[in-house]
């Protein structure tokens, strides 16, 4: 299923929040991503319709497909971040740059970075 950058950011955010707490709330997602609650509501609707998340009215949950996709996006983020840090980029910039790069680098470039990072 095709997603866009925004959807990937939401899935990654929900994954990270769910690792910190059993329950993820829309307001936490809005705060972490830096968007309005109506923007989160719109994204939740689209991600629910795509089968990536479920919502019980208060809490957001990743479906199996959503968790799998979010984990792949986050793994990509981590490899890029680690690659940048290995090349002297400070941790804060490496993390910020990885957020941008994870959406636009080619699979070949990602695989090269992964091979380099994993040794």
Q: Language-model segments: which ranges?
A:
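N-terminal helix-turn-helix DNA-binding core of bacterial DNA-binding proteins
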Residues: 2-35
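Key DNA-contact positions within bacterial/archaeal DNA-binding proteins
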Residues: 38, 92
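Basic amphipathic alpha-helical segments that dock to polyanions
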Residues: 10, 29, 40-48
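A short, conserved structural fragment
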Residues: 48-58
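Residue-level signal for threonine
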Residues: 4, 63, 106
